[in-house]
Amino acid sequence: MNIVDCKSALKTLNNGLPIVFPTDTLPAIGCLPKFSNTIYEFKKRDRDKPLILMGSEYQQLINYVHESAKEDYENIASKYWPGALTMVIPASEKQTTILTSNDLTLGLRIPNSYMAQSLMRLSLIHI
């Protein structure tokens, strides 16, 4: 496996291809949100299971959270992130269904990994 820098990984992401990167738990397969169908197809993932959207800080992901869940999201995120916790939470109605599972939920996480957070900060997007 080649180890590449964040800028090379970002170029791959911008070309619509997935990357594998380390997190604080297991390696992640990631892509830009607009290419999320790639992950469902690549992993043969059931559409009933939400994908995990990662960011470098919890405020980055607040717009993906349904209005009814924002208070709980902020309370839990500020206490447990960065870290290994993935929140499965109702997705904002503003977000496209391409990012959500069939039940309109989304997994959100801020990994406690310098490399993962650097990649997300550099890209100014979420993976």
Language-model region placement:
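Active-site-adjacent structural elements in enzyme catalytic cores
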Residues: 1-126
